[in-house]
Regions:
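Glycine-rich S-adenosyl-L-methionine
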Residues: 199-224
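Conserved beta-strand signature within the Rossmann-like core of class I S-adenosyl-L-methionine
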Residues: 226-233
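Short, electropositive alpha-helical surface patch
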Residues: 237-255
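Conserved SAM/SAH cofactor-binding pocket of Class I
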Residues: 102-189, 193-197
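Short "lid" loop at the C-terminus of a central beta-strand within the Rossmann-like core
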Residues: 191-192, 209, 234-239
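N-terminal auxiliary segments of SAM/dcSAM-dependent transferases
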Residues: 1-82
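Class I SAM-dependent transferase core
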Residues: 66-115
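Class I S-adenosyl-L-methionine
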Residues: 249-295
Length: 296
């Protein structure tokens, strides 16, 4: 009964979010040709909309005000960037790409000992490119970062260039693994096995744990002898009863991977510390893990 109650609370929260979004989307504004907003005292939204849509529009269209505000906020974050102390710089993330705002999982990546003579690493589902950049800063000479999202690929490329790391990191538009083997393969898949309701949620939800299992099941075949696969994941899904506690260990077994070490930390982001959050009962218990795995 407790399992069903907790799952119901999560799905109720998601339904309320969707209903609120539908209601807010009923109030729309007209965007004129060239992304203009012809309203009294309206801000210039051209740069924000270009960030989202790319090529400017020839004909007017209606855009929900709530979405426009989200686009403006995302554009401001894109310009400002997220400071990553371990990089000695910022990661700039546009709308539609996962932002490394909660940095505790990055600390785990910096703490884990690299495999001996780590010459080549893969970053699977690179997103903003932040994990690839951190591995480059740690001295891994050759890194291949993969993603299927064109926005993410462009974002990662721009970040690596800005940080002066583009010679160390090659980006490939492939699903999961490139056609090679590596000494280290890292992956930070979406942490919740639920269905995204919008494009912006795709980096947060992994329906059916497809990416998680795809990474684990393919890791051993892409590791060099003595190589390691690092899985970075939170246990929030377990506290929401969306994933069984034994699920990960069963996945490791199926994928012929042994756990050689586990690093963990507690999230410090706002939602984790907010007792008024609808999912506070789960977020306050959440732990983020880095599993160091080796082929059997």
């Amino acid at each position: 009964a407790a399992d069903a109650d907790i799952q119901a609370a999560f799905h109720r929260h998601r339904m309320q979010q969707a209903q609120q979004s539908r209601l807010l989307n009923m109030l729309a504004v007209e965007i004129g040709a060239g992304f203009t907003l012809d309203l009294p005292r309206a801000p210039d939204v051209r740069a924000a909309l270009h960030d989202v849509y790319g090529q400017a529009n020839d004909a007017p269209f209606l855009l929900p005000l709530n979405q426009l505000l989200g686009f403006i906020g995302a554009h401001e974050w894109h310009k400002k960037g997220v400071d990553i102390p371990a990089l000695g710089g910022k990661i700039h993330v546009p709308f539609g790409v996962f932002s490394p705002l909660r940095g505790e999982y990055l600390d785990l990546l910096m703490q884990a000992p690299l495999p001996a003579s780590c010459q080549h690493a893969f970053d699977i589902g690179t997103g903003s490119g932040v994990l690839a950049a951190l591995l480059a800063r740690r001295g891994v000479p050759h890194i291949t970062a993969t993603d299927t999202n064109p926005r993410a690929i462009a974002c990662a490329r721009a970040n690596l260039q800005r940080l002066g790391l583009e010679k160390q990191v090659q980006i490939e538009a492939v699903d999961l693994f490139p056609a090679a083997r590596a000494d280290l393969i890292v992956c930070n898949p979406p942490w919740l096995p639920a269905k995204p309701t919008s494009a912006i949620e795709a980096a947060l939800y992994d329906p059916g744990s497809a990416m998680l299992q795809g990474f684990l099941n393919g890791a051993a075949a892409h590791l060099k002898p003595g190589g390691e696969a690092w899985l970075i994941i939170s246990d929030l899904a377990e506290h929401l009863h969306l994933r069984a506690p034994e699920f990960l260990s069963q996945c490791f077994q199926t994928a012929s991977l042994n756990v050689i070490d586990i690093l963990h930390t507690k999230p410090q982001h706002q939602k984790a510390l907010n007792s008024a959050d609808p999912l506070a009962f789960a977020r306050t218990q959440e732990t983020t893990y880095l599993y160091r795995l080796r082929a059997k």
